[in-house]
Amino acid sequence: MIVIPAIDLREGRCVRLFRGDFARATVYSDDPIEMAQRWASAGARWLHVVDLDGARLGQPVQHELIERVIRAVPDVAVQVGGGVRTLDAVERLLVGGAARVVIGTAALERPDMLREALARFGVERVVVAVDSRDGWVATHGWETVQAIRVEEVVHRVVLLGVRRVLATDVTRDGTLTRPNLELMGRLAALGVTVIASGGVGSRSDLEALARVPGVEAAIVGRALYEGRVRFERPEDWVIGAEAA
């Protein structure tokens, strides 16, 4: 399982939210580019960059900064999300150097757009974000809870051809209280590869996630920024069987 550091952008700074609450944001750096280079120097293979302002507004607003981050780490693959709700937004991010683009709200509200994105850009370059609060889907920057279970959304997008989902338990995001292993396992059992997010607070949490069949990667934010988990070599960023 690959560990992916998170770089969440809000008003040009690197922040972390607590349980998806924009009113409870902690600023970890005023220089996201320096932060990206820090993780790259430590051997990270991937970065996960989120435009939080874009997620709230429904369209990416930090394109230029994101492209600068991508250019600053040429040897690292960068996955980008936040407010990606049109084909033009997907294309611009990919042209700007993103290795993968994450589609969230639009995957539920605009399935035809998702289908076209998969056809035009390829299933390996499109990831669907499924964010949940107590099992219910959270959309529009995690501020709206929909009357649909997260498993149903995954089932729908699998039928459209999606192969990889980014699953976040918003109630655990930024809490360091252990990932929702049961949720990740249930979603992986639906026939997708899972990138897990939310709740990682220690290396033992990562080892537990690595044992869940179908979990390919884990996104880690606060635990890295506060030094609860430390990685200094490329091999440190791989947990479990793949490290052999």
Swiss-Prot record:
Protein name: 1-(5-phosphoribosyl)-5-[(5-phosphoribosylamino)methylideneamino] imidazole-4-carboxamide isomerase
Any GO BP: L-tryptophan biosynthetic process
Family: Belongs to the HisA/HisF family.
Gene3D superfamilies: Aldolase class I
Positions annotated as active site in the UniProt record: 8 (proton acceptor), 131 (proton donor)
Pathway the protein contributes to: Amino-acid biosynthesis; L-histidine biosynthesis; L-histidine from 5-phospho-alpha-D-ribose 1-diphosphate: step 4/9
Keyword terms, alphabetized: Amino-acid biosynthesis, Cytoplasm, Histidine biosynthesis, Isomerase
Source species of the chain: Thermomicrobium roseum (strain ATCC 27502 / DSM 5159 / P-2)
